[in-house]
UniProtKB/Swiss-Prot annotation:
Keyword Metal-binding assigned: no
Entry's Gene Ontology BP terms: 'de novo' UMP biosynthetic process; pyrimidine nucleobase biosynthetic process
Name the record gives this protein: Orotate phosphoribosyltransferase
EC numbers for this chain: 2.4.2.10
Database matches in InterPro entries: OPRT (IPR023031), Orotate_PRibTrfase_bac (IPR006273), PRibTrfase_dom (IPR000836), PRTase-like (IPR029057)
Species of provenance: Clostridium perfringens (strain 13 / Type A)
Transmembrane parts of this sequence: none
Entry function: Catalyzes the transfer of a ribosyl phosphate group from 5-phosphoribose 1-diphosphate to orotate, leading to the formation of orotidine monophosphate (OMP).
Assembly description: Homodimer.
Binding site for orotate: 120, 148
Catalyzed chemical reaction(s): orotidine 5'-phosphate + diphosphate = orotate + 5-phospho-alpha-D-ribose 1-diphosphate
Pathway terms, separated by semicolons: Pyrimidine metabolism; UMP biosynthesis via de novo pathway; UMP from orotate: step 1/2
Length: 192
C-alpha cells in the first residue's frame, strides 16, 4: 500500500465515510460496504488533502474545464478546479435527464475533466460525458475520490485518490438479502 493510499483510507475512516452494513447502491447493486464521500466533503481541509492526491495526477493533463455531475461530483469539481486553477461547473438532472443548466456552457473543442466522488459503474459520468460531447466538448479524463469499479468501465483515462475493491452483488445474488438483512439506500441518483 502506498503512503497516499494509507492517508486516504485513514482520512475516510476518520470522518465516517467508510461504512459497513447492507446497502442498495445507486447502480442497483447491493454491497456490504459503502463509501459516503459526503462525510469527507463536509471537512474542507480533509477534502483538500485527499483531492490533492488526484490533483497531482492531473498536473500534466491538458484541459480547460472541470465538470462534476450532481450530486457527488459538484464539490469534487469545485475543489479540483480550485487546486488546479481551472473553472468548474456541474451537470444535473432535469426530468430524469442529465443536462447543463444555470447558464453553464461548454465551448466547442474545450477539453474537459469529469469528476465524481465515487465511481462504481460509471453511469453518472457517462451521462455527463454525453452532455459534454453534445456541446462539442472533449472528455480527456475522469477523476474521482474513490474508484470502486470492478474493472475497466470507460475508454477515458481514469484517475483516483484511492482504488478500493468493495464487493457488490446483483440483488438476486446478494447474501445479505438471503439472510434477511434490511438494506439502506444512501445514494443520490434518484434526485430529480
Amino acid at each position: 500500500m502506498k503512503n497516499t493510499d494509507a492517508m486516504v483510507i485513514d482520512t475516510l475512516k476518520e470522518v465516517g465515510a467508510l461504512l459497513e452494513g447492507h446497502f442498495l447502491l445507486s447502480s442497483g447493486r447491493h454491497s456490504n460496504r459503502y463509501c459516503q464521500c459526503a462525510q469527507l466533503l463536509k471537512y474542507p481541509e480533509k477534502a483538500e488533502k485527499v483531492l490533492k492526491v488526484v490533483a497531482d495526477q492531473l498536473k500534466d493533463i491538458d484541459f480547460d474545464l472541470v465538470v462534476g455531475p450532481a450530486m457527488g461530483g459538484v464539490i469534487v469539481a469545485y475543489e479540483l478546479g480550485r487546486q488546479l486553477g481551472k473553472p468548474a461547473i456541474f451537470t444535473e438532472r432535469e426530468n430524469g435527464e442529465m443536462t447543463l443548466r444555470r447558464g453553464f456552457t461548454i465551448e466547442k473543442g474545450q477539453k474537459v475533466v469529469i469528476t465524481e466522488d465515487v465511481v462504481t459503474t460509471g453511469k453518472s459520468f457517462k451521462e455527463a460525458a454525453k452532455v459534454i460531447e453534445e456541446q462539442g466538448g472533449e472528455v480527456v479524463a475522469v477523476v474521482c475520490i474513490v474508484d470502486r469499479t470492478p474493472g475497466n468501465v470507460t475508454d477515458f483515462p481514469m484517475y483516483s485518490s484511492i482504488k478500493l475493491d468493495i464487493e457488490s452483488f446483483e440483488a438476486e445474488n446478494c447474501p445479505l438479502c438471503k439472510e434477511g438483512v434490511p438494506y439502506i439506500k444512501p445514494g443520490s441518483r434518484n434526485i430529480k
